[in-house]
A protein has these predicted regions:
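N-terminal alpha-helical targeting/anchoring segments
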Residues: 1-145, 163
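TRNA-recognition modules of translation machinery and tRNA-sensing kinases, especially anticodon-binding
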Residues: 26, 140-443
């Protein structure tokens, strides 16, 4: 969530940030300001009424003492009893008012929370406004392959070499699914092992999280409630609980320290996870996206960092560099793109995409998005650290990046490394995982 103090201090700046993301939140921001005034007013009213009740209780305590003394002396206590009863009646009425206030306060708080959760993150000020038309390619890395023959599509190459079985994948699980077979399965596993070994060498902690999550994980990551209907759900027939199949390991890693206060000495936390990812991918695929470029299940290694706010920019640069090195290590041609505000996901303040060339698609496809959420996810998940100098808890910053997803690296590798006879040259960094094999050829 965005800090409500920022909204109250400069609502126009928040509205401008939302417009840069191509989201009209003016009415929501105005409602947040109204609700905040109402909530604070109601809390003040409740506190005043509670103070009145406490004053009556204190007064009755004195009156009971006076009544007891009067009874010992045989004096008339009717006036004291009348005042005590009046105070008790007033106290009961105050209790009713406080109960009404608390119910109304809950309704207002719930609406305020809903409004706050619906706001996207503020984009960093250096991002261009608007959508993908304003994305900025920053650099092109690696030699762009040129062919002295007519290059084939990765679907044809994979089928000819027996790497992927698309038809039987559809038979098993429907459209948008495939089976890695033989050397295809080994090549996929080699890619994942290469990614994992690189992250371990960089000192990142390896995590294998559950593949299904509670709703709160998606809420913390900022993917829910807006995108809750775009992921696969598993309903438990014995109760009302629903689990959600992992759309990305980010949703799991982000919640590992939810509702915890970390020590400053523990930061940064550098994690990575391997998981299959499950996406409903509603809507039809474009004709040029046949094959494995877009599917319902794919493998991905995800990088994640929890850090102090002042270390956030350096952490972002580190993740971008790591993603670039992974692709460069494969000898593939790619580019790094700075996304415009409107092309960043709702939870992110900034994002760089690593886009790889897939020749058959005559363009670049994202294989990694490296993003900085600033304190947006930490506020949603109440993830904090205690600063040693002050002893006070502060929200951490969270960052994530694909490191990497294979469903686009695989076809890019196959197409960029193809030879005229339809064989595939294996990148040198993968050969140790494949028994030293240098080329995948048709048997």
């Amino acid at each position: 969530m965005i800090d409500i103090k920022r909204i109250k201090e400069n609502p126009d700046a928040i509205k401008a940030g939302m417009k840069a993301k191509e989201v009209d939140c003016d009415a929501t921001i105005d409602r947040i300001l109204e609700l905040d005034v109402q909530v604070r007013g109601l809390k003040t009213h409740t506190e005043t009424k509670t103070a009145e009740k406490n004053k009556l209780a204190k007064e009755n305590g004195k009156l009971f003492g006076q009544k007891k003394d009067a009874e010992k002396k045989g004096e008339d206590t009717s006036a004291l009893e009348a005042q005590i009863n009046a105070n008790m009646a007033a106290s009961v009425k105050i209790d009713e008012e406080i109960a009404e206030d608390k119910q109304k306060l809950k309704e207002l708080d719930d609406e305020l929370t809903t409004c706050m959760l619906s706001l996207p993150n503020m984009p960093d000020p250096d991002l261009l406004p608007g959508g993908k038309e304003n994305n900025q390619p920053l650099r092109y890395i690696g030699e762009k392959h040129s062919f002295d023959f007519e290059p084939k599509h990765h679907v044809d190459l994979c089928q000819n070499l027996g790497l992927i079985d698309y038809e039987r994948g559809v038979k098993l699980a429907g459209a948008g699914n495939w089976i890695y077979t033989g050397m295809g399965a080994r090549l996929e596993w080699a890619l994942l092992n290469y990614f994992i070994d690189c992250h371990v060498a960089d000192g990142y902690e390896f995590i294998l999280p559950p593949h299904m999550l509670e709703y709160q994980c998606g809420l913390t990551a900022g993917q829910f409630p807006k995108f809750a209907d775009e992921v696969y759900k598993i309903a438990n027939p014995t109760d009302d609980r629903v689990h959600y199949m992992l759309p990305t390991a980010e949703a799991a890693l982000c919640s590992i320290y939810r509702d915890e206060i970390l020590s400053e000495a523990d930061l940064p936390k550098k994690l990575f996870a391997y998981t299959p990812c499950f996406r409903r991918e509603a809507g039809s695929h474009r004709a040029d996206e046949r094959g494995m470029v877009r599917g319902h299940q794919f493998n991905k290694v995800e990088m994640f960092q929890f850090c102090k706010p002042e270390d956030s920019d350096a952490a972002f640069d580190e993740l971008v560099t790591k993603a670039e090195k992974l692709v460069a290590g494969l000898g593939l041609h790619f580019r790094t793109v700075k996304l415009a505000a409107g092309d960043c996901s709702a939870s992110m303040a900034r994002t760089y995409d690593i886009e790889i060339l897939i020749p058959s698609m005559d363009g670049y496809k994202e294989v990694s998005s490296v993003s900085n959420a600033r304190d947006y996810q930490a506020r949603r998940g109440n993830i904090r650290f205690r600063r040693e100098a002050t002893g006070k808890p502060e929200f951490v910053h969270t960052l994530n990046g694909s490191g990497l997803a294979t469903s686009r690296i695989f076809p890019a590798l196959v197409e960029q490394n193809q030879r005229a006879d339809g064989s595939i040259v294996i990148p040198e960094v993968l050969r140790k995982y494949l028994g030293g094999m240098e080329v995948i050829e048709k048997k």
